[in-house]
Every structure is written in C-alpha cells, then in structure tokens.
Amino acid sequence: MRPMRIFVNDDRHVMAKHSSVYPTQEELEAVQNMVSHTERALKAVSDWIDEQEKGNSELSEAENMDTPPDDESKEGAGEQKAEHMTRTLRGVMRVGLVAKGLLLKGDLDLELVLLCKEKPTTALLDKVADNLAIQLTTVTEDKYEILQSVDDAAIVIKNTKEPPLSLTIHLTSPVVREEMEKVLAGETLSVNDPPDVLDRQKCLAALASLRHAKWFQARANGLKSCVIVIRVLRDLCTRVPTWGPLRGWPLELLCEKSIGTANRPMGAGEALRRVLECLASGIVMPDGSGIYDPCEKEATDAIGHLDRQQREDITQSAQHALRLAAFGQLHKVLGMDPLPSKMPKKPKNENPVDYTVQIPPSTTYAITPMKRPMEEDGEEKSPSKKKKKIQKKEEKADPPQAMNALMRLNQLKPGLQYKLISQTGPVHAPIFTMSVEVDGSNFEASGPSKKTAKLHVAVKVLQDMGLPTGAEGRDSSKGEDSAEESDGKPAIVAPPPVVEAVSNPSSVFPSDATTEQGPILTKHGKNPVMELNEKRRGLKYELISETGGSHDKRFVMEVEVDGQKFQGAGSNKKVAKAYAALAALEKLFPDTPLALEANKKKRTPVPVRGGPKFAAKPHNPGFGMGGPMHNEVPPPPNIRGRGRGGNIRGRGRGRGFGGANHGGGYMNAGAGYGSYGYSSNSATAGYSQFYSNGGHSGNAGGGGSGGGGGSSSYSSYYQGDSYNSPVPPKHAGKKPLHGGQQKASYSSGYQSHQGQQQPYNQSQYSSYGTPQGKQKGYGHGQGSYSSYSNSYNSPGGGGGSDYSYDSKFNYSGSGGRSGGNSYGSSGSSSYNTGSHGGYGTGSGGSSSYQGKQGGYSSQSNYSSPGSSQSYSGPASSYQSSQGGYSRNTEHSMNYQYR
C-alpha cells in the first residue's frame, strides 16, 4: 500500500534518520562472526561434556534420563530428541538485540542464553568457560578474551579487534521457573539445591529474555514499519534522557501495541506519529492503562518500574514531539537537519532490513529453531497464513530493487558511452537501438525506449563477460530470454524486446513483463494477426501448451500457413497468437511493399441494402466534379437536392437521373452529377474537366422521347481510382427496366464498390480493372465475337447472369467484383493504352481510347433494332463496362488522355 501523501515528508525524514543510525555492513559482519564462532564453540563444549558424562558411570547416565519438565517447551527446549534431553547443555539461543534485529551503530553488547538441563551451578559455569576457550581456538583463529561473572550467572566474551564487541552468555534452566511456580503454589520441594547454584533472579531474567525474543519474532518482525520505528526510538531514548526509562522491552511492547492495532499498514512516518499519539494520550500515566506484558502468566505492567515523575515527563515530551511533527518539524524530534523539499529518487536500500533480522539465524542447534513462536500463540494462528503471504510477496518484490544490469556494468566499467544507432517504427511505438563499446567489442540491443535499450545492451555485455545480470531474482528463464533476444529484430515495431520466433517449438519469446508495455505490432504498424489474415484467410490458431501456475501462465499457440507451422508464446492466448502471426509474417512475407498497404486503408463501408449478392466492399474515395464523388451513406429515394433527382422526369442541367423510382444523384445527397447536368438529344455531348486530383470525362447520349442521359466516366489521376456512372435505360414503351436504376461503380485498381444499392432485381455494373502490375489489355480481331472476363470473386458469387428485356436488349452481368469484357464485331476494334489500361467496348466501327493513367472509362454503344448493327441473339450476350443504355443512340467516342 502506498503511504498517504500527508506523511510522505515524515517518511523521508524517518527513513533518513534510520539510515544514519543503522549499523554498517562491517559492524554487522563482526557481530555475525563473533556470534557464530561462539555458537559453534558452545556446541563443541556440549558434546565434550556429554562424552564425559557417558564415560563416568551408569548411575549418572540413569540420572540424566529423568523426565524433562512440562514447562520446558515454553522456554524453547521442547520437542527435542531424547538424546538431546540427556545432555547437560541443551542448547544456545540468541536473545536481545541480536535476535530482534534492533542493533544500531555503537551497540557493542550482545547476548546469548545457554539452556541447561538442571539448575546451573558455579562448577558448571567454570567447566563451560574453561573448555570454551579451548574450543574457540579450534573454531577460529580470532582471539577472544573469556571472563566469568558468577554474580550475573554469565560468561563474558570480548574480542581483541575493532569494534570492541562484548558477548554475554547467560546460563539458565527451565527448572528454575518451574520450582518458583511450585513454591508460589505452596508445594514443598523434595530436592535440595546444590550449594553453588547460580542466582535465581538472573536465571529467571534470562528465561524472560528468551520469551521476549520469541514473542518479538512472532509479533513485531512481520509488522510493517515496526522494527524501523523501534530502531529510531531507541536512538531517541539514547539522546533524550527523559525517554531513557522506556528503553528496552517496554518500548518494544509500546510500538507493537500502537502499530499493530492500526486498521491498515502504515509507512514509517505515520507509524512513528501513531506511537507518539499513544504516549501523548497518557498511556504511561499513573492513572493510565499501562502496558501489559504478554510474556508473563500473571497480569504484569511492563512499565511498573517507572515512578510518577518519569511518567509525567515522558508524556509531556511525547506531546511536545507530536506538536512538532504536526507542524512539519519532525526533524527536530529526530535530531537531524531538515531535508530539502525535493530529493532525487534513489533506490531504497532499507528494504533488506525492514522485516528481517540483521543477523541470519544460527544453524548450530537445529533442535532449537527460532521460528517456533507462531505455534505458541494459538490465537494468532488464523492470520499466520496472511503474514506468510505478505512476507513472500515482500521477498519477491525485493530482488528487482537490487542493482540492475546497467548499474552493475557502470560499476565494473565506469564512463561507458552509449550511442543511439537508429530509431525505427511509428511515432506511437518507436524502437531504439543503442550500442556500447567495451574492451574493443561492440554490443548492440534495442528496446521501446533509450533507457530500456541501454539496459538490454548492459545485459548482453554482462552475459558476454559471464557475470550476473541482476535479473536472477526473477524467473531465470524468462529474464535471460528477454535479455538474449532483445536485439533480435529491430525492424519490427514492437514495444517489448523483439524475438525472431521460428517454427521450432523451443523458440524463445519475450518475457511477459515486457509485453505489458504496449501492443505487439508489425513493421507496418498493424496487429500481426490482422495483417496475416489479410494475406491468408481462414487460418486456425491452436493451443499447443499451457504451463505455469495461476499467477504466471505461459501459453503456446501454433498456426499453419502455406504448410509451415509457426509458434508463439505469451502470458495469454492473445499475446501468443500475435507472436505466432508475427513469426509467420517475418518468414513468409518479409518484404511486403508498403505501396499496396497504402491503398488498403480502412474505410467506412456503405450499408448493405441489396442483400448478400450486392454486398458493399471497401473502396477508394472518388474525385468528383465540384464536390465529393460519393456519399458514404446513400441518400434515400425522393430526396430533393440541387439536381432534383427524385421522381421527376425532366431535361436540363442538374436533373441527374430522370425516370421513375430513381433516387437522387451520386453527389451531394441527390444533387445529380455534381454541378454538371446532362441535356437530352445530345448524342455525343461530352464533359471533360481536369483537376489536380483527377480527370473526369463524361459523355451522354440523348434519347428520343425517353430523354435518357448518356453514360459518364470519371477517372482519377491516382492509381486505380475511378468512377463510372450509368444512365438508366428506357424501354420503348417508357417502362422502366424492372423498375431498377443503374449502379455506379468505384474502382480502386483491384476492387470495386457498388454504391447506391437498391433492393431491386437489377444486376450490378462495375468498372473492371486489375491490380497494379497485373493489367491486361484485351483486343479482338475482325470477324470475331468473343468475350473476356477477368474477375475477382465477390460475396455475390462468381457466376454470370443474363437478363433479357423484351427481347430487344440482351446483356450479361458478371457476378465478379472486378472484371472486364470487350466485344468486337466485324470491322470493330478496341484499343487499350497506358500502364493501367481499362476495358473499353466498341461496336460497329467505333473506338474507345483510354489514357495513360488508366481511370476506367466506359461507354455504351448500342443500336436499336433499326440501326445498321444489332447485337442480339443467343451468342450476343452483351455487357459493357458501365454502359449507359438509351434508345436510338448513335455511336459515341470518348477520348481521354492525361
């Protein structure tokens, strides 16, 4: 949980103070060495005494088999093996500051407790002290001075080097407390004590310190900020004489009671303020509640030794300190200078000492573990699992805050210059490639940011040197994979470290931690699954494996493309699919040109109105005369625009489509053909106007009494963009052909869109073209009557359908999305010029020329039954590309050049 903002400044000051009073690593190592040497030596002394007793007599051996006291388990010697229960020296345990992890700078006094089977005597103390000197010389080369303190029931060991540490070994036995309880209960003791038995009160105090250490490990060590606050307040007790009487066990109980009763974990600053509030409320006053000692059977006040004046002084000092903290003067309470308002962020180095003891636990006596206190407090068994989970989370969170690869490398090779080699990818997901030269070798790596790229470079350098990279704390496989493959494919636009995934099942994939930084994209900035689907439809992704626990799943997905299988892995199936698709794209389509991708932008599709056969397709925007060529949403019938195209049959400019049941024009929501109208009775009236964005040409053939307009063709200067609009044919009897209107066609090189779909039974007419690089021109010689079609399948089906109207006009409509037909009879010819040739139609000596840029121009040449040429009959299924149909039209010519 993040600390509350109002306590952030207090947290900084408390942690700064804590860092200043915390012992140095050298001091802790000296303590660790002295304690471990003494424990090993005492274990050897215990073995030596045990061998001596076994060699004496069977009588002494029988005496050693006495049943141990019941209360022994509460003193830390229970549940031991039978062979250890016969020993005179049961074990050695750490107590005091060493066991609790409360050592500060300058703390030179260390404590151990040596548990004995019987009441310790002066003779036993002398024997242990004498043999301890011998055993220490065998354990270590360090010199130690051993002193005997019979009055204190202890052995004192002092080292001869800096810092001058003093280790006190207290001798005690659980029998001392058991006998005292029997005396208090009024029982008569049948066994007389030896004359040289050690002081009973000293032995009881040693047993109490053992209980205190176990209680502290169970209750305070796992409490957030508790140990830190106790360390800071221990320093306060040393600096301020008023607080001196609280030093030790009362202070530890007070801090645990104050912090442990909070309803949430607190930061160091807030926890310290809560302890001050507890004291300021009068808890230590004579009429206050006092501090209950949980380690005593009888109700005991841990501050019972304080007199009235001391209690009042402590309460007043706490109130004054609380006022200072409330007004932002906590640094005065801590005895330090105020910190600047803004400090540079530094990696926390207090985490390793927050919740763990300063000295690792001893393994000398495996029979007396220090992790037993949770079993003694039965009422605390329920939250024990939570505490263990919290500790595990904290242990997992600690390693990433250690030195990373970049910091490690800078320590080993200071002054390295990192250079930016390249920056690729789109703006929203760039890929940076950094390099560094180390000992003449150049290393490169890439990442979604310069900082990450530098980190990946450092990982590579450290791996090359055979040194740890700092990522071992996490899952080694994932961490190393990410580092090794970080520079695999810098050309791919992917925020995580990019990996070249191959069809091998043992492929290496980026770690899940990096995939959270952003989406996985191809070098075209698209989702890999989407881009692969554009190239190969209907692919199936299969789940190959699912590994890891619930908190760390790993999915492997496989896809088969063109007979090859590609795999991808990730923390979920979506990520795994993306990497599998990415691998397939890199292997099968490494050099896909971007020119085609530019024409395949997503566009808003026109709503389908004619059923699946006339399904709308994405299209390129046309370039109209004076306005947008195509409205994304078709205008409803009978809309009145500038062209007045609805249900009005007239002649003149702007009328658009004349005739019944014809909706508005294809521009400006029913405004006819833009600002250009088509007059009737004009057989070869053509309009041509060129703009910077396209050339447009339209011709109209006038009809007789029907007044039908001719066909119009709009061609764009852009590749593959054109617009062809038909004119509705009129029957001789002025009956609309199936009540349908002609369809306009938009062509984008390889796909066309049938706009203005109406739910009428009318075939679609499209301009025909093939993609760039696939254009073909079709010409027909004299005397031939043939049909060519180059079409792409559309949802409407690939078949052709013939329509016959009153046995006078026969034409076929191709079901393809794009195709082309060219027809020629005797004496006719069709020309197709330019790099993107369209498909022209000609009949009866007419010619159709189309210019270089290849907008698809279409025209219709039809003769009525009375004309010199007639196309009819079973073999004369006639289809023109976007032909306009009108009766009694003459042959028209349309020339369009760039």
UniProtKB/Swiss-Prot annotation:
Compositional bias annotation for Acidic residues: 60-73
Domain named DZF: residues: 5-378
Annotated crosslink Glycyl lysine isopeptide (Lys-Gly) (interchain with G-Cter in ubiquitin) location: 297
Coiled-coil segments on the chain, per record: none
Basic and acidic residues composition-biased segments: 74-85, 372-383, 472-481
Record-linked Pfam families: dsrm, DZF_C, DZF_N
Modification Phosphothreonine, positions: 67, 188, 315, 592
UniProt-annotated stretches for the region Disordered: 52-85, 363-402, 466-495, 505-524, 631-661, 719-898
Name of the molecule in the record: Interleukin enhancer-binding factor 3
Organism: Mus musculus
